[in-house]
């Protein structure tokens, strides 16, 4: 029995891809495979001011290490700040021992004679520890007002910080990491039509409600007036084998885009891996358990679109009759008959080694008369 041959490629984010505005330009993909933006923002006027105006979003987007550092520094800073204020109150009222108060003197805050004592009183008051060793007397109405102000301000601060922590934890970002796109898109015939296909799977048992997959074709475009648009965006529609607009994503599904005369992909040289474009895929849905909107993104470059392949079936039945989704087969593709009706352009920019190797594999498959599985992985 002939063994199945597999070929692995290493694909990094920094690639020698086709130029946007001319030959010889190195560029990175606009969107990484895991959905992160590769766009760098520069020369934004008053950027810091704009971020400070929207503190809520700024704190939520902040990385955890900076958030924890800011959280600790904020509490320690307020304890010390109000500790200094309590110390100044004690100085103004003559409560310090070095000021030699009279024997019948009643301090504003009992047992606060040093800056350290004032700091401890501030900490105990703000955290509502209340050891009882240091306490406010009725001698100073100003001290009572100061205590109320400290508790109100720090409570508001605690609510804000706690809210940003909870909002960051509750974001559906981690839920999006359990939605998986296939590493490659494939082009083959489906129901007698040439189709570009991608595979999507939900790796949790909880469902996504109202799933929709949309695509954006990013490429250089020249208008009739001669204007060059560096990243022109064109909608690419995807569908599944169902009449519903919201697929039931309980098992891995294959989404199809029919490459016909109305398709924005019809003039692209998909077979040769040639061209300067990027296909961005976006899956949107509602998380069943939290009702939060979740969005997952990925992108495909020309060399990540395989011509004349289809996905290996990844769903099977166990001996007990249960459905099994085998994710070891999720990214595997198998050679099939090439679809007809699509452009077959001469290779100009394709990776010569890759194309030569794939051609030799096709010839080997024809000689052996067996299906050839080619898997190209990103690392």
From Swiss-Prot:
Sorted UniProt keywords: ATP-binding, Cell membrane, Deafness, Disease variant, Disulfide bond, Epilepsy, Intellectual disability, Ion channel, Ion transport, Membrane, Nucleotide-binding, Potassium, Potassium transport, Transmembrane, Transmembrane helix, Transport, Voltage-gated channel
Species annotation: Homo sapiens (Human)
Cytoplasmic side: 1-61, 167-379
Tissue: Expressed in kidney (at protein level). In the nephron, expressed in the distal convoluted tubule, the connecting tubule, the collecting duct and cortical thick ascending limbs.
Effect of residue 167 to V: In SESAMES; loss of localization to the basolateral membrane in kidney cells; in non-tubular cells, forms functional channels; important loss of MAGI1-binding when transfected in tubular MDCKII cells, but not in non-tubular HEK293T cells; the orthologous rat mutation results in decreased potassium ion transport
Disulfide bonds: 108-140
Activity regulation description: Channel activity is strongly regulated by variations of cytosolic pH; channels are activated by alkaline and inhibited by acidic pH values. Inhibited by Ba(2+) and Cs(+). Activated by phosphatidylinositol 4,5 biphosphate (PtdIns(4,5)P2).
Protein name: ATP-sensitive inward rectifier potassium channel 10
Gene of this entry: KCNJ10
Binding site for 1,2-dioctanoyl-sn-glycero-3-phospho-(1D-myo-inositol-4,5-bisphosphate): 36, 168, 171, 173
UniProt intramembrane annotation: 115-131
Gene Ontology MF terms: ATP binding; ATP-activated inward rectifier potassium channel activity; inward rectifier potassium channel activity
Site (Role in the control of polyamine-mediated channel gating and in the blocking by intracellular magnesium): residue numbering on this chain: 158
GO aspect biological process, one term: central nervous system myelination
Family named by the database record: Belongs to the inward rectifier-type potassium channel (TC 1.A.2.1) family. KCNJ10 subfamily.
GO annotations of cellular component type: astrocyte projection; basolateral plasma membrane; cell body; ciliary base; monoatomic ion channel complex; plasma membrane; presynapse
Function: May be responsible for potassium buffering action of glial cells in the brain. Inward rectifier potassium channels are characterized by a greater tendency to allow potassium to flow into the cell rather than out of it. Their voltage dependence is regulated by the concentration of extracellular potassium; as external potassium is raised, the voltage range of the channel opening shifts to more positive voltages. The inward rectification is mainly due to the blockage of outward current by internal magnesium. Can be blocked by extracellular barium and cesium.
Transmembrane spans: 62-88, 141-166
Clinical note on disease: Seizures, sensorineural deafness, ataxia, impaired intellectual development, and electrolyte imbalance: A complex disorder characterized by generalized seizures with onset in infancy, delayed psychomotor development, ataxia, sensorineural hearing loss, hypokalemia, metabolic alkalosis, and hypomagnesemia.
Subunit structure: Homotetramer. In kidney cells, it forms heteromeric channels with Kir5.1/KCNJ16; this interaction is required for KCNJ16 localization to the basolateral membrane. Interacts with MAGI1, alone and possibly as a heteromer with KCNJ16; this interaction may facilitate KCNJ10/KCNJ16 potassium channel expression at the basolateral membrane in kidney cells. Interacts with PATJ.
Lineage of the organism: Eukaryota, Metazoa, Chordata, Craniata, Vertebrata
InterPro entries: Ig_E-set, IRK_C, K_chnl_inward-rec_Kir, K_chnl_inward-rec_Kir1.2, K_chnl_inward-rec_Kir_cyto, Kir_TM
Outcome of mutating residue 140 to R: In SESAMES; loss of localization to the basolateral membrane in kidney cells; in non-tubular cells, does not form functional channels; the orthologous rat mutation results in loss of potassium ion transport
Residue numbers on the Extracellular membrane side: 89-114, 132-140
Binding site for ATP: 210-217
Listed result of changing residue 65 to P: In SESAMES; pathogenic; decreased potassium ion import across the plasma membrane when mutant channels are expressed in Xenopus oocytes; results in decreased channel activity and a shift to a more alkaline pH for activation; no effect on localization to the basolateral membrane in kidney cells
Resulting phenotype, residue 297 to C: In SESAMES; no effect on localization to the basolateral membrane in kidney cells; severely decreased potassium ion import across the plasma membrane when mutant channels are expressed in Xenopus oocytes; the orthologous rat mutation results in loss of potassium ion transport and a shift to a more alkaline pH for channel activation
